[in-house]
Swiss-Prot record:
Protein name: Envelope glycoprotein
Extracellular side of membrane: 23-611
Organism of origin: Feline endogenous virus ECE1
Gene: env
Function in brief: The surface protein (SU) attaches the virus to the host cell by binding to its receptor. This interaction triggers the refolding of the transmembrane protein (TM) and is thought to activate its fusogenic potential by unmasking its fusion peptide. Fusion occurs at the host cell plasma membrane. The transmembrane protein (TM) acts as a class I viral fusion protein. Under the current model, the protein has at least 3 conformational states: pre-fusion native state, pre-hairpin intermediate state, and post-fusion hairpin state. During viral and target cell membrane fusion, the coiled coil regions (heptad repeats) assume a trimer-of-hairpins structure, positioning the fusion peptide in close proximity to the C-terminal region of the ectodomain. The formation of this structure appears to drive apposition and subsequent fusion of viral and target cell membranes.
Subunit structure: The mature envelope protein (Env) consists of a trimer of SU-TM heterodimers attached by noncovalent interactions or by a labile interchain disulfide bond.
Polar residues bias: start-end ranges: 271-286
C-alpha cells in the first residue's frame, strides 16, 4: 500500500530532523537557565499539549499528560474529523463512516474506548530490518507483532532502548456493555471531553538523547476488533532564552518608571584624628558609570543613555576602583597611582566565604549568564567551595561543601559575587548538573586588575639618579635570538650560543621563516593579478559608457568630473615582487651552500633523523666488532691453549713417581 503524499513528506522531514538533531547542543555554561517547553504534536501537525518551565538543559524531564482525543481530533480515521484539539465538547456529531462503538464523539464511546488496551511503536532509532518489518505511517509503525516497545496492554510491551513509556492516566471502568446503562453511568464520569489522558514518562535512554529539539515520533494503536486503529504523535523540546520586557508600553500591567540614579552625597564628617575622605569631582554614577541626568522635568518616556566609548569605560573602571578605595581606606588615597593593566588577564577573582541561597524555581538572575564560559586565570584567597574540588585547587578552599543535596534546586551567589566553576563564570548553579558531573565551583568577588603604586614609584622613573625597585623583565623570542643571524656571536659564546647557530634546528627555523615569507609573496602576487584583471574589466565598462554618452562628450563630461583617468601602479608592485623573488633565490642558494653533503639528508624527510639516530649506535658497535673481533678472538684462543697445556702437564705428573738417582762411583751417596 502506498502511503499518502502528506505522510511521505512528514516522514522525510522527520528523518532529516532526526539526523541533525543530535548535533544541536547548547554550548557555554551548563548552569544556564532557559525556558524549556515540551510540546506534543498530532498527526495533523498541531501542538495539542505543552508544558513550560525555567530550568537548565538536561535537568527537567516532566511527565507529559496529553489526552487521546486531542491527538485524534481532525483525523479521518476517528469520529471527530472536523474538530480541533482546542474545541472538544461533551457530545459531538460523529461521522457516518465511523460508527464503531469506540471513539471520542460521545461519553459512552469514550467509556468503551477505555476498556481496550493500546500499544506504542517508535519510528526513530530503528535499524533498517526493523523499519522494513514494522512499516511506516500507514501502519503506525506496528505492522508486525514485536514492534511495540511500550503501551498499556495485558502482555505488557517493554523495551530497553526506547526513549519513553506511555501508559493510561485514567481508571479503567468496570463495565460499559449496555448502551442505555452506559448513557446513564457515563453521564458523570465521561462527560469531560478530555477524559482519556495518557501519561508519558522519559526513560534513561530518553534522558541521554540529543534530538529532542527536532523531535521523535511514535505510533499508538488500540487493540480493537477488526483492524487496530491508532494515531501518530511527536514529542519535541523547544528551548528559548529567558527574556525581560523593556519599553514604554503602558498596556503592560507591571510597567514601572525606571529610577534615575544619582551619586549619593556623603554627609560631612566631624573633624577627628582619622584622615578625611578625599573629595572626588565626578559626575559618574557608581552603579552604571553613565553621566547623571541633569535636573529638570522628566520626559514622558524613559530614554536610554548613550553607550560610552572604550576610553570612557576604562576611565569609569579606574574611577570606580578609586571611589571604593577612597571610601574604605582613605589613608591609601592621599598620594597614589592606579594603573590599569594593558595585557590580560583584566580581572581577578578573590575567593570569599558567604551564604548562598537555595531556590526551588530558577530566579531571573540565573538567566543572565554569558553564553560563552568566561575563564578567570587569576584567583586568590580562601573561600567557599562546592563540588568535587581537584587537589590543584584545594588551596583556594577554606570551607568545602562536597554535596548540598539532591533535587532540581538552584544555588545563587550573594549580590556582588559570582561562582567561578571549571565551566566558567556564573551567578547561579544548577544543583542537579553539579551532582551529575565532576563540576566544582568557588565563591568569589570579581575585581578589575588595577595596580596600586605610591607616588615614589612613578617619580623614580622620571627623576635622574632615582632608586626604585625594578619590575621583572619579560623577554620575547626575538630578544633572546636577536643578533644570531648578523654574526654577533661574541656575546653568546659564554652561554653556549655559538653552538646554537650551528645546529640543524636553528637552520630549520630560518627555512620555516623563509617559507612563510615566500607564501606571503605569492599571496601578494595573486592579489596583484586579480587587481589587473579587475582593472581590465573596469576599463572595458568605461569604454562602453563612453560610447553611450558620446553625444554628451563622454562619461566624464556627462558626470561633470574634472579628474577622470586611471593610474596603474601595479607595475611598481610587479617590480617589487620580482626583486623579492630574486632575493629568495639568492637566500636559498646561500642555505644550500652552507649545508654539508650529509646535512641535506636530514631535510629530505622528517623521520630520517630519528631513524639514523636510532641505528647509528648499533651500526658503530657492529663495525667495531668486525674490525677488532678476530684479533681479540685469536688472543683469547691462545690464552686458553696455554692454560690447557699447563693443566694437562699437572694431570700427567700425578700418575708417575720420581725415581731415586745414585752415582755408580759413589754407591753410598743416595739422593
Amino acid at each position: 500500500m502506498k502511503p499518502p503524499a502528506g505522510m511521505v513528506f512528514l516522514w522525510v522531514l522527520t528523518s532529516l530532523g532526526a539526523g541533525i538533531g543530535a548535533k544541536i547542543v547548547k554550548e557555554g555554561n551548563p548552569h544556564q537557565v532557559y525556558t524549556l517547553t515540551w510540546q506534543i504534536y498530532s498527526q495533523s501537525g498541531e501542538v495539542v499539549w505543552e508544558v513550560q518551565g525555567n530550568h537548565a538543559l538536561n535537568t527537567w524531564w516532566p511527565a507529559l499528560t496529553p489526552d487521546f482525543c486531542q491527538l485524534a481530533a481532525g483525523l479521518d480515521t476517528w469520529d471527530i474529523p472536523d474538530r480541533s484539539p482546542k474545541n472538544l465538547e461533551t457530545s459531538m456529531e460523529g461521522t457516518s463512516q465511523q460508527l464503531t462503538p469506540q471513539g471520542c464523539s460521545k461519553p459512552w464511546k469514550r467509556c468503551a474506548l477505555t476498556e481496550r488496551d493500546f500499544y506504542v511503536c517508535p519510528r526513530d532509532n530503528r535499524d533498517r530490518a526493523t523499519a522494513h518489518r514494522c512499516g511506516g505511517y500507514e501502519e503506525y509503525f506496528c505492522s508486525a507483532w514485536g514492534c511495540e516497545t511500550t503501551g498499556d496492554a495485558y502482555w505488557q510491551p517493554t523495551s530497553t532502548w526506547d526513549l519513553i513509556t506511555i501508559t493510561r492516566n485514567y481508571t479503567k471502568p468496570d463495565s460499559c456493555d449496555d448502551r442505555v446503562e452506559r448513557e446513564r453511568k457515563t453521564s458523570r464520569h465521561w462527560r469531560d471531553p478530555l477524559s482519556l489522558p495518557l501519561k508519558i514518562t522519559f526513560t534513561d535512554s530518553g534522558k541521554r538523547a540529543l534530538g529532542w529539539q527536532t523531535g521523535y515520533t511514535w505510533g499508538l494503536r488500540w487493540y480493537l476488533p477488526g483492524k487496530d486503529r491508532g494515531i501518530i504523535l511527536k514529542i519535541k523540546l523547544k528551548i528559548d532564552t529567558i527574556t525581560q520586557t523593556v519599553g514604554p508600553n503602558l498596556v503592560l500591567a507591571d510597567q514601572k518608571t525606571p529610577v534615575q540614579l544619582a551619586i549619593p552625597v556623603q554627609p560631612p564628617r566631624a573633624p577627628t584624628q582619622t584622615p578625611r575622605v578625599n573629595p572626588v569631582n565626578s559626575t559618574l554614577s557608581p552603579s552604571l558609570g553613565y553621566p547623571a541626568p541633569a535636573p529638570g522635568p522628566r520626559p514622558p518616556y524613559p530614554t536610554s543613555p548613550s553607550r560610552p566609548g572604550t576610553g570612557d569605560r576604562l576611565l569609569n573602571l579606574v574611577q570606580g576602583v578609586y571611589l571604593t578605595l577612597n571610601l574604605t581606606a582613605p589613608n591609601q588615597t592621599q598620594d597614589c597611582w592606579l594603573c590599569l593593566t594593558a595585557k590580560p588577564p583584566y580581572y581577578q577573582g578573590v575567593a570569599i566565604i558567604g551564604n548562598f541561597t537555595n531556590h526551588t524555581n530558577a530566579p531571573l538572575r540565573c538567566s543572565t549568564t554569558p553564553r560563552h564560559g568566561l575563564t578567570l586565570t587569576e584567583v586568590t584567597g580562601y573561600g567557599l567551595c562546592i563540588g568535587k574540588i581537584p587537589p590543584s585547587h584545594q588551596n583556594l578552599c577554606s570551607q568545602t561543601v562536597p554535596s548540598v543535596g539532591q533535587g532540581p534546586y538552584y544555588l545563587t551567589a550573594p549580590n556582588g559575587t559570582y561562582w567561578v566553576c571549571n565551566t566558567g563564570l556564573t551567578p547561579c548553579i544548577s544543583l542537579q548538573i553539579l551532582n551529575d558531573t565532576a563540576d566544582y565551583c568557588i565563591l568569589i568577588e570579581l575585581w578589575p586588575k588595577i595596580f596600586y603604586h605610591d607616588s615614589e614609584y612613578i617619580y623614580g622613573h622620571y627623576e635622574p639618579g632615582g632608586r626604585f625597585r625594578r619590575d621583572p623583565v619579560s623577554l620575547t623570542v626575538a630578544l633572546l635570538l636577536g643578533g644570531l643571524t648578523m654574526g654577533s656571536l661574541a656575546a653568546g659564546i659564554g652561554t653556549g650560543t655559538a653552538a646554537l647557530i650551528e645546529t640543524n634546528q636553528f637552520k630549520q627555523l630560518q627555512i620555516a621563516m623563509h617559507s612563510d615569507i615566500q607564501a606571503l609573496e605569492e599571496s601578494i602576487s595573486a592579489l596583484e593579478r586579480s587587481l589587473i584583471s579587475l582593472s581590465e574589466v573596469v576599463l572595458q565598462n568605461r569604454r562602453g559608457l563612453d560610447l553611450l554618452f558620446l553625444q554628451e562628450g563622454g562619461l566624464c563630461a556627462a558626470l561633470k568630473e574634472e579628474c577622470c583617468f586611471y593610474a596603474d601602479h601595479t607595475g611598481i608592485v610587479r617590480d617589487s615582487m620580482a626583486k623579492l623573488r630574486e632575493r629568495f633565490k639568492q637566500r636559498q642558494k646561500l642555505f644550500e651552500s652552507q649545508q654539508g653533503w650529509f646535512e641535506g639528508w636530514y631535510n629530505k624527510s622528517p623521520w630520517f633523523t630519528t631513524l639514523v639516530s636510532s641505528l647509528m649506535v648499533p651500526l658503530i658497535l657492529l663495525l667495531l666488532i668486525l674490525m677488532f673481533g678476530p684479533c681479540i678472538l685469536n688472543h683469547l684462543l691462545q690464552f686458553i691453549r696455554e692454560r690447557l697445556s699447563v693443566i694437562q702437564a699437572l694431570v700427567l705428573t700425578q700418575q708417575y713417581h720420581q725415581l731415586r738417582q745414585f752415582d755408580a762411583e759413589r754407591p753410598d751417596a743416595i739422593e
